[in-house]
C-alpha cells in the first residue's frame, strides 16, 4: 500500500524535474548572447569596415532582413553556427514560414566550407550535417543552425536506411543516434528550392502548431546512381522519455570522420 501511494508522488517529482532541466540550464547562459554578438558586433563591423569579426562571415547582399552571419561556436574545433541577421527567436518563429523567408538551411549548407577549412580537407557530403534544436533544448533565443561533422554511427545508420527513405515524411525503420526520427529525402546538390522549415510545417501533421517542440536535422547524402541529395530528419520533443528535441546531438564536434574517413571526398562542385 505504501509503495503504491508513493509512486505517483515520485513520478510527479521526476516529471517536474525533467520540465525544469532546460530552464535551469538556460540560466547558466545569457540567452541573448548570440544576438548581441551578431547584431551588436558582426553586422556593424561588416557595414562600417567590411570586416565581419568576431564572425567568420556576414552576408547582407539581400539586406539585413534576409542576411546571415557565420560564427565559430565555442564547443569543438569544427562547429560553426549560421545565424540570421534579423531577429528570429527560434524554430517556432513565424518569420521562417513567411512567403519571402530566406532559406537559412541553404545558406548553412554553403557554410560547411568553414568546417572543412577547420579540418584541413574536404569531406564527402554524407559526413556533414546541419541541425536546429527545439525550444526545450536550446539555450539561445536567436535562431542558429549548427553546422558540423556527422557522428560516425549516425552516418552508418543513415547509409543503411538510405534506400528506404522516400520523398515524404515517414517514421524511420530504426532509431538514429538512439532516438526515433521521421525522415524524408530531397534531391539536388544544394538546398536551393528546398526549405526544411517549410517542408516540416507543411508535411507533418500538427507540426505547424507545435514547431517549438520540433528539431530539424539535415545530412548530405548520395542516393541511387550517385545522385546528390539530402536526408531530412525531424523529431518532436518528449520530456517524459527524456527527449528534448536536440537534433545537434547527431553531430560530432570532435569530427571523428575527419580522422577515420576512408571514403574520398566528392568532387568540388558537386558536394
Show the residue positions of the predicted features.
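N-terminal secretory signal peptides that target proteins for export/translocation
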Residues: 1-6
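Bacterial N-terminal signal peptides
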Residues: 11-22
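HIT superfamily nucleotide-processing domains
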Residues: 27-271
Amino acid at each position: 500500500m505504501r509503495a503504491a501511494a508513493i509512486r505517483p508522488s515520485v513520478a510527479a517529482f521526476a516529471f517536474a524535474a525533467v520540465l525544469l532541466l532546460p530552464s535551469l540550464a538556460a540560466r547558466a547562459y545569457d540567452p541573448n548572447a548570440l544576438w548581441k554578438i551578431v547584431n551588436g558586433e558582426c553586422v556593424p563591423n561588416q557595414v562600417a569596415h567590411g570586416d565581419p569579426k568576431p564572425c567568420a562571415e556576414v552576408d547582407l547582399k539581400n539586406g539585413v532582413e534576409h542576411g546571415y552571419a557565420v560564427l565559430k561556436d565555442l564547443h569543438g574545433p569544427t562547429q560553426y553556427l549560421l545565424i540570421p541577421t534579423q531577429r528570429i527567436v527560434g524554430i517556432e518563429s513565424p518569420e521562417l514560414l513567411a512567403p519571402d523567408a530566406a532559406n537559412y538551411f541553404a545558406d548553412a549548407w554553403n557554410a560547411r566550407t568553414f568546417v572543412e577549412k577547420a579540418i584541413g580537407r574536404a569531406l564527402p557530403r554524407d559526413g556533414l550535417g546541419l541541425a536546429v534544436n527545439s525550444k526545450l533544448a536550446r539555450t539561445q533565443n536567436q535562431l542558429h543552425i549548427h553546422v558540423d561533422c556527422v557522428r560516425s554511427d549516425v552516418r552508418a545508420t543513415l547509409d543503411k536506411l538510405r534506400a528506404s527513405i522516400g520523398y515524404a515524411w515517414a517514421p524511420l525503420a530504426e532509431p538514429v543516434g538512439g532516438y526515433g526520427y521521421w525522415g524524408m529525402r530531397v534531391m539536388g546538390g544544394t538546398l536551393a528550392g528546398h526549405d526544411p522549415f517549410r517542408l516540416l510545417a507543411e508535411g507533418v501533421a500538427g507540426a505547424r502548431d507545435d514547431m517549438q517542440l520540433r528539431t530539424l536535422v539535415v545530412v548530405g547524402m548520395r542516393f541511387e546512381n550517385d545522385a546528390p541529395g539530402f536526408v531530412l530528419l525531424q523529431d518532436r520533443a518528449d520530456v517524459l522519455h527524456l527527449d528534448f528535441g536536440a537534433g545537434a546531438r547527431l553531430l560530432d564536434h570532435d569530427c571523428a570522420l575527419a580522422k577515420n574517413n576512408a571514403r574520398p571526398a566528392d568532387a568540388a562542385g558537386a558536394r
